[in-house]
């Protein structure tokens, strides 16, 4: 009998073991679709980004008009740009849902997979930030100025660090060129980290909604989950194309239709919607260094999650109190997102401060406490 190339060829064998003959739990729900959706997002973003980079000029005098030129004169340039800009939003929707799934079902107990995932989130955030600066509109320029300026809060080396990052004494041409270089490079770093993420995942196998060992009941990834993933792709690509074709500027800021002007500050500087929760936490602390530390902590706290798991059961499927707390956390994040988009005035200041406090309290104190309480309740 001739050897099966799919199982014997050094390269095809790797593809086979991770996408075709991979044993997967039979009961994983649609919440397990987001990993593959993120893969599709990454591929779409790299493809559209490559096409955009061919028409982009990373120079302060030409950046804005080169983007306008792409939209006006390049074949389907408007579509490529709209897919790229809104694709970023869908990337973040998918990653937030993916993290939420991991949190709800205790997937963070696979520590290496979880930690590489958090590193992926941080890299994605960095990529989105430097990418937002490239069109060189008003919000691009002032967003870059405000966020890079935060590094000046670091004691002793802060100011030097900021000027080193800027390549001068303000956000200018050197900043734009290096941000373009970084924006081109980082997606490939994300792709590399994704492979590490998957390598760690395939060491343990997937978790499942019950959080129990499922080795006795595994099914092949293909055709069952390949088909399910294709359904997921359709469910994501449909709203993405709808958004890109019907209201491409819905999630953008109108300020970005104005070319960058260092002499005029926009009335409300705010980032894209996917950073608003962190921005609200940053603004809720009146002290600059304190705000920067809170901003960093709001994302880095994810590294602590595996150590804060005190429950005997892995998932929240049969833990109603933890479920309630989880949805309170989700609501809290939505409130933070809303507050981040509002001006700094009463009542938004106090709402933001309370929501920020609640965010850290839930994660650091309430989840471990409720987990321990539920353990006690199991004994009765």
UniProtKB/Swiss-Prot annotation:
Component of the ubiquinol-cytochrome c reductase complex (complex III or cytochrome b-c1 complex) that is part of the mitochondrial respiratory chain. The b-c1 complex mediates electron transfer from ubiquinol to cytochrome c. Contributes to the generation of a proton gradient across the mitochondrial membrane that is then used for ATP synthesis. The keyword GTP-binding does not apply. This is Cytochrome b. Its main location: mitochondrion. Binds 2 heme b groups non-covalently. It is found in: Mitochondrion inner membrane. PROSITE patterns: CYTB_CTER, CYTB_NTER. It comes from Pterodroma hypoleuca (Bonin petrel). GO terms for biological process: mitochondrial electron transport, ubiquinol to cytochrome c. It is a multi-pass membrane protein. InterPro entries: Cyt_b/b6_C, Cyt_b/b6_C_sf, Cyt_b/b6_N, Cytb/b6-like_sf, Cytochrome_b, Cytochrome_b_C_euk/bac, Cytochrome_b_N_euk/bac, Di-haem_cyt_TM.
